Each structure stands twice: as structure tokens, then as C-alpha cells.
């Protein structure tokens, strides 16, 4: 599948910044794939994290945190609200709209400290917030204890607004991951609040880089006046985060506002360039003060016109914004998960990035439920090639990707399944 970029209707500065994002002609699969359904009948599985022996922690948005042991046994650890069947329940945790239990990460020193980290929505405060919590897992992996709320001030959307997908609980980000240097990363979203992305103090629309106690990681370099936990800001709703295997550089996958899904190489202190405020960049007022969906609420705009009217990365206003290395040919198809393929069995794709899509099938947008393999140039992090993976199962709304310790690619779907894809000769 060839991915090109129609650069009409873009400012010249945008064209210059995006020229590097045009990949070459895609190749075919380098290997065939074996397919196994690891789990099914789940409630919107959101994320996965592994121990070296193949033990898999996973979250379900409205149910909670569970663990699958290597023998296939599943233990339900932490329930959302009063969800039955869990060893422990977080009574303040709830799900609504896009919100609920989202990301999970395993501490690099888990063998010694038994710690895991979970990002979930909480009604402990009013207004409600999204929280990054730390727990200890007991020795036989049947329960968690010792809850510590490391980050308790990520905003949550309390009320419905006049936008598509405008209900409560929108745009929370949600990915939690450890970088190769041991820092803990958390991605957050804009809640359909136009003031959040460029705010120095509101913790939505950010990528936070933390130590394991929730403090700002040493070396963070946000602009003056910003919360020191900020690694990057000006994001819309990052849900994909992975680290380049050669450099350790964090790379995000972020779905756009009915145009321009993006893959972006993060820069410490960088601005993602998302600013949906009214009366900016030539725009006037917008419904409920949020312009992020306004072009979608106006008839007759194609994806290029929408991109020019409400840019995902606004280079005119923020000429030093981090440029995306790929923009999905101007479409927004719900890019979500991100990972890197590991192991020689992947052939030419070893070390390539993979991204998943939830799919959006209205307003002229192709549905796009798929997994793409994004090959990066050696020596610099730019896109060389993008190939749609030929899947041995039917496409679904693919939420998350994770590389297991066995080198297989694990894929969660909104249809309640976790798939395992293993390359074969």
C-alpha cells in the first residue's frame, strides 16, 4: 500500500515540514503469520504488558486489570468500581465514553519490587480526573495492594459538548510505558477543551515523563512556566507510544480530527502544534469554544480542506512545532497502538514500527481497520516505507499492540479479543 501526501491547501511552511513524511512504494509481507486467539469475550481490552516469562497483564476499559499466566490461567486483579469477580476493587474507578481503565506498564525491576502502573478514570475528586496509579502484585499473581496515586490531576471531560463524539469522557490519551532509561511515560488528551493543549499547567494534551514516584524525571526541559513533569505538549489525543530500538527515542501515534493521523518523533520540551482554540489561525468562533471538530461540522470540506482549516500540527502559529514523520495521506482512521517488531523471524521487518487502527467509516473516510508496518530509514528517524500487514484473521477495531517476550505481536481489539501473530518462514 503506497502512502502519499496531497499537499494542496497547506501553507508553505507545512509543506516543507511534511515533505520528509512521504514514504516510498510499499513492499509485500516479508513473512507469513500464524494466528492464535489468546483471549476472547473481553470487555474492550485496552492495553497489555508482559513479564519475561510470558505472563501478560491486560486491562479492560469497563472491567479492570487482569493477568494471564503462561499456562493460560487468568486472574482478575483490580476491578473498575463494583465490577464482580475481582480480587480488589477500586470503588472510585469508573468508565464512561472513551474513559475507564486504560494503560498498564510493568516496572523494569518487577522481579524485586512487584510494581505495576495503571492509568484509569476516577471520581475521587470533583471534577473527576484521570489518574496514574502504582500497585504491588502479590507473589502468586492473584491480587494487588498498596495503591499509590502518582498523578491525580489529568483532566476528565465531565459534560457533553456540541461536537462529533462529544459525550463525557472524551480524549484521555491513556498509554503508559517505560522508556529504555527507566523513565515512566504517560500520554494524555485534550478532553475537547481548547485551552488544554497549549496550557502550561493543565496536564491534558501532554506526554509526561516521570520517575517511579510520579515526580518530574530528571532532564525534562519544558518551556519556562510549564509543569516540570511535561516532556511534550500540544497534543490532541496520543494513544500510541513506542521507543526506537536503536536510539530509545519516544515516537507517538496520534489520531487526528477526521484528518491527518500522525506519527511523530518526540523532542524534549517540544510542542505538538495542536491548538483548537477559537479565533486562531484565521478561524472565528466554534461550537462550545472547541474548533477541533468544526470543519467536520461544516458541509463540503474534503480532508485536505479540513487539514488546512484546523491543522493537526499548526506550523503557521507554531513554526517550531515537532513535525510528524507520517500523516496517513490526510485521513484520520483512528490510529491507536504502536510497537516495534523484535526478532530475526520478522525478516526485513525486524526493528520496524507497527501501528494499529480502530477504523473510521463515515464522512467519506475509508474504514481502515488494519495494522501498518512502518519502516524507518537507518541513521535518521524518518519513514522509508509503509506496508499494510496481510492479516491471517478478519480485521477488527485494533486498539493496542505489544511485542511479547517470544517476539510475537499481540493485538487487542474493541471486539473483545487479544490476538497473537507469530512470523513463520
Please identify what each model-predicted range represents.
Residues 2-12:
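Bacterial N-terminal signal peptides that target proteins for export
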Residues 11-21:
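Bacterial N-terminal signal peptides
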Residues 22-26:
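Sec/Tat signal peptide C-region and signal peptidase I cleavage site
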Residues 27-195, 248-252, 256, 331-379, ...:
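Acidic, Gly/Ser/Thr-rich repeat motifs that build Ca2+-stabilized beta-propeller blades
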Residues 34, 161-162, 227, 387-389:
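Short, flexible loop segments at the rims of nucleotide/cofactor-binding pockets, characterized by
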Residues 85-95, 99-101, 109-111, 131, ...:
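Beta-propeller domain segments
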Residues 174-176, 240, 399-401:
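Short, surface-exposed beta-strand/loop micro-motifs that present aromatic residues
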Residues 381-405:
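Conserved blade-ending motifs and adjacent loop-strand segments that build the rim/top face
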